[in-house]
Amino acid sequence: MGKLLEKKNKLKEGEMIQLCYDEAFKIMFANSKHIEILTMLLSKIFKVDYEALEGKVELLSLKVSSKKIGEKKCERDVVVSIKHDEIYNIILEVNVKKKFYQSIMNRNLYYTFQTAGHTLIEKNTYDEMPYTFLINFNTFFINRTKKEVFEEFVLQDKYGMVLSDKYKVFNINIEECYNLWYHNNYQGKFESYEEDLVLLCASLMVSEEKEFNSILKMIQMKPEIKELMEGKIREMNHDEKLVTEYRTWKDENERINASIINEERKEARQEGLEEGRVEAKKEIVLEMYRNNISLDMISKCTNLSQEEIKNIINE
């Protein structure tokens, strides 16, 4: 029993806690002592120089208090205010559970409007309302037709007339960013800020410290910020309580993603794919691997040996 617990609270050599784990995301980006990390991320999202936001970013409370009896409590991942010409309140949410994406999107929109209401100062007019932006780091496209890595939504009517510019929703598909980085298929497709953002978002998905450090080297940022981020990763990797919680989260997420992929396999078979077809199995293996599902779980789902799986991955 003791050995089992010891294994649960320690990472393998070279492994790291993924930043798409919401607690790790908060530790990295919702840290008032090292606000420069979050400032750098926001500068890439909003396509401005780091210096334009330096000293203007302030973390807000993650919890919204309410006196209403029975009102659902909420705690956001990161909430920040930027005072730059206007006031911008920004909610950042990270999620990798594809199965519940609609429910999660509804929750995040609720957070957005609730935050806007709680930050309206009594003496201000409604014209003076802060801008409130929601930034989702997800593993899916909202618009499945366009399939854009960076999606942007505003309140508008069916003819395209904007109802209010005070609210915006950004959806960033971090899994697609990871795939673009992994296959070295991002260069020349984006402008410099977006290219850096693709790499930053890819870094949220990696599970090896070597890969994380390699990605950071490719991103334009101050050396001291890079060192801070690398230091934060090392701290988290040696936090046994956090590692235990991360492993529980990862196991659950693997089960959810594996069940989704199994459902997709059944649908594919119904459309005429035979169970034993090599190409079909290869695609399933690669899809599960890209979703950071363990070799053991892939083996159970595909009936392939771990050696066969490694050969497919390394082809």
Task: Describe every region a protein language model picked out.
Residues 165, 172-222:
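An acidic, glycine-/histidine-flanked metal-binding catalytic module
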Residues 2-19, 23, 81-95, 202-315:
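Short, charged alpha-helical interaction segments and adjacent helix-coil junctions
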Residues 42, 108, 112, 197-204, ...:
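Short amphipathic C-terminal alpha-helix that caps PH/PH-like domains
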Residues 41-45, 54, 58, 108-110, ...:
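Generic preference for flexible, low-structure residues
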Residues 1-170, 175-180, 185-187:
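Accessory alpha/beta interaction modules
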